[in-house]
Amino acid sequence: MMFPGLLAPPAGYPSLLRPTPTLTLPQSLQSAFSGHSSFLVEDLIRISRPPTYLSRSIPAASLSPPSQEAPAALADSGTSDLGSPGSGSRRGSSPQTALSPASEPTFLKFGVNAILSSAPRRETSPALLQSPPPKTFAFPYFEGSFQPFIRSSYFPASSSVVPIPGTFSWPLAARGKPRRGMLRRAVFSDVQRKALEKTFQKQKYISKPDRKKLASKLGLKDSQVKIWFQNRRMKWRNSKERELLSSGGCREQTLPTKLNPHPDLSDVGQKGPGDEEEDNPGARLAYHAPADPRHLLEGPLPASPAHSSSPGKPSDFSDSDEDEEGEEDEEITVS
């Protein structure tokens, strides 16, 4: 009878002869790690393993904050440790210098390895805390993100804001131009003023072609000549109204009407013989009625004031004069 336990080697013996899996790798994995590509499946598996499987010793000088060359150096040391059979003794001899999970180049602060690891988390490196903060706006109530929307023209000269061209330029453009409706007062020279005054004495209301011709002759704009005539007529009308009111007239005589759209007030205050006859109709009737009716039959009839007046000036008593002449003719024929 044979006892299998006696012939079979103990269970722990093959494990002593067999190399540790963490120390030696198959030929395929060794060729994979020998390459520099970091996108292979083996590299991703090695990176995703817990730190206890890939714990390796590093010198004390490497405990300083990791730099840009640290991941490459750690990767090279890791491959050399995995390939060397004596790395286990070094790992066992220096447990204090073992790399903590927080200092791994691929360590995630909120990853599964960080949550399940029993090692205390390291605080943020003082060198990282001493990094200069991002530059913000000079004023305490504005952050750096609002700086492009603020121009230096809205703040005093002591502000350190650099003006950005093309940012909200419409308020500045509108501020420099005069508002619509505010026209600058034109300054006329003596020659221009004399020419305008001479033309105004000839005609108070200048026509559009004459106005354009006068503007081109004097080197002015058509609107300037138009406004000058408007202001001059208003000044002239006010002076004539004062003269008319002082002489006992009414203001309506100076205003334009449908029959006389352009009243001429140059003769205000100066009454001619026709005006005296209109003011005294009794004298006009006495002037037309002769003392002897026979003289009317022998001689021609005198002209009526309506016919003697100028044709350009309308007379308010033209209808009444014609009626009175008809009555006088009837009386003359009857007598």
From Swiss-Prot:
Sequence ranges of Acidic residues compositional bias: 318-335
GO BP annotations listed: regulation of transcription by RNA polymerase II; ventral spinal cord interneuron specification
Role, per record: Could have a role in patterning the central nervous system during embryogenesis. Has a key role in regulating the distinct phenotypic features that distinguish two major classes of ventral interneurons, V0 and V1 neurons. Regulates the transcription factor profile, neurotransmitter phenotype, intraspinal migratory path and axonal trajectory of V0 neurons, features that differentiate them from an adjacent set of V1 neurons.
A GO CC term attached to the entry: nucleus
Pfam family, any one: Homeodomain
Organism: Mus musculus (Mouse)
Key words of the record: Developmental protein, DNA-binding, Homeobox, Nucleus
UniProt-recorded name of the protein: Homeobox protein DBX1
CDD domains: homeodomain (cd00086)
